A protein has these predicted regions:
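Proteins that catalyze or organize thiol-disulfide redox chemistry
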Residues: 1-55, 62-109
Length: 109
């Protein structure tokens, strides 16, 4: 059963991301952000393609201001990759599907 994208907030971030057995992709976004709206469907697609290999999650920075601040998110969209509770890498700005998939595959090696 496809779990889909996990929706994060300040309360569930630690459990869902830092406590995850799988590597995590976290998309920091906001509804009012045009580039974020373009990245959203791409994030949904890679969630399906990497099911069981990655946990894919989204954090609306308006609902998760504390978490966004903790991780120094200053511009959105920002995509961060976590593994074993640690930030492995991050990217700021809109990404295409092929670029995002390549980054995910690289982190699985």
């Amino acid at each position: 059963m496809f779990v889909g994208v996990v929706h994060l907030n300040d309360e569930n971030f630690k459990k869902e991301v830092l406590g995850s057995k799988l590597p995590c992709l976290v998309d920091f976004w906001a509804e009012w952000c045009g580039p974020c709206r373009r990245v959203g469907p791409v994030v949904e697609e890679v969630a399906a393609e990497f099911e069981g290999k990655f946990k894919v999650a989204k954090l609306n920075v308006d609902d998760g201001q504390k978490t966004a601040s903790t991780y120094g998110v200053m511009s959105i969209p920002t995509i961060m990759f976590f593994k074993n509770g640690q930030v492995m890498t991050q990217f700021v700005g809109a990404m295409g599907k092929s670029e995002l998939k390549a980054k995910m595959e690289e982190l699985l090696r």
